[in-house]
Amino acid sequence: MDKFRVQGPTTLQGEVTISGAKNAALPILFAALLAEEPVEIQNVPKLKDVDTSMKLLSQLGAKVERNGSVHIDASQVNVFCAPYDLVKTMRASIWALGPLVARFGQGQVSLPGGCTIGARPVDLHITGLEQLGATIKLEEGYVKASVEGRLKGAHIVMDKVSVGATVTIMCAATLAEGTTIIENAAREPEIVDTANFLVTLGAKIAGQGTDRITIEGVERLGGGVYRVLPDRIETGTFLVAAAISRGKILCRNAQPDTLDAVLAKLRDAGADIEVGEDWISLDMHGKRPKAVNVRTAPHPAFPTDMQAQFTLLNLVAQGTGFITETVFENRFMHVPELSRMGARAEIESNTVICHGVETLSGAQVMATDLRASASLVLAGCIAEGTTIVDRIYHIDRGYERIEDKLRALGANIERVKGE
């Protein structure tokens, strides 16, 4: 397995170009199964999960090509089962189910894999499809969905806010007969992006970005060209990298209005932040950040995917900061690893209490999930001495060429090929 070797401390400064959002690209790739004509998807990040999704679409009979953009022609899809060997590495595969049953009347997906953070069941996807009229069976480790004729529009009230299930229901409802209303829908920018992609193909969707999405079913979806929005979590990660190293950064190809909660906390930490239409700059003017209190919650509140990075910020900040995680359980696996580097923190149920220290020292640490591992790499950039981050396949699932981008900012980081 590959590792990163990072030499610190360094001050990170310069420019970085933000990639397309993984969490929008994946649902959009699967939503392309609904289209009867070719689609072109631009600004798709080059990531392991994206490659897996493209492979899965090919196995279903879609023509998939990548030359800068991703081109998908799903007109000849003739296989309706997403097999275990691909699904086991990536839980996003569940998003194949809604489009398959909506367009072809049948679909089956092996139960998914992915990061191991707490309970992320597929129940909400299943109950949503059932409310649209699908029959669901769980057999031999597969979720099997079928419907006679078309799905039927329904008024669906989600038990809890779920990005994944909102995507599934919204995609399936585009081809259902009649109108579907999703109450307590997720409001994430990636949901809005997926909805806008579907609208490009001819879907009728209103209310995306609010907690009530209305979908008027149409008979078919055509083709189109669509550009995936910038990755707000990658943007936030690089902003934190500059903040903790007392540096300055310009993020290009960014979308500032998707990061309001994060930018507010960075300003509280003492960062000087400016934004333009598609850029964000941060300058610490050489100062150490101040500790901030953060509580994660569904969008538009502070994103759980930025929690590990802000935990690190607090651990090297002036003062004491509290970080409360309300979205996923078991999401503080980076804290013991950071403690090995000299961080001072206590975990009390779903809150981590961070006591800022002046410096961290390099150590051998292990990545446990995608965002936690990014925080370990950033810690290595500012720690005294050498840090080895093991199991970085987690990082490759969500960050495009993170080491190249960090190197361009002055980090001393190299990928060490594993056995």
Swiss-Prot record:
Pathway: Cell wall biogenesis; peptidoglycan biosynthesis. The keyword RNA-binding does not apply. Phosphoenolpyruvate binds at K22, N23. Its EC number is 2.5.1.7. Disulfide bonds: none annotated. GO terms for cellular component: cytoplasm. Keywords: Cell cycle, Cell division, Cell shape, Cell wall biogenesis/degradation, Cytoplasm, Peptidoglycan synthesis, Pyruvate, Transferase. It catalyses: phosphoenolpyruvate + UDP-N-acetyl-alpha-D-glucosamine = UDP-N-acetyl-3-O-(1-carboxyvinyl)-alpha-D-glucosamine + phosphate. The modification 2-(S-cysteinyl)pyruvic acid O-phosphothioketal is found at C115. It comes from the Bacteria. UDP-N-acetyl-alpha-D-glucosamine binds at R91, R120, P121, V122, D123, L124, K160, V161, S162, V163, D305, V327. InterPro entries: Enolpyruvate_Tfrase_dom, Enolpyruvate_Tfrase_sf, MurA_subfamily, RNA3'P_cycl/enolpyr_Trfase_a/b, UDP_GlcNAc_COvinyl_MurA. The active site is at C115 (proton donor). Belongs to the EPSP synthase family. MurA subfamily. This is UDP-N-acetylglucosamine 1-carboxyvinyltransferase. It comes from Salmonella schwarzengrund (strain CVM19633).
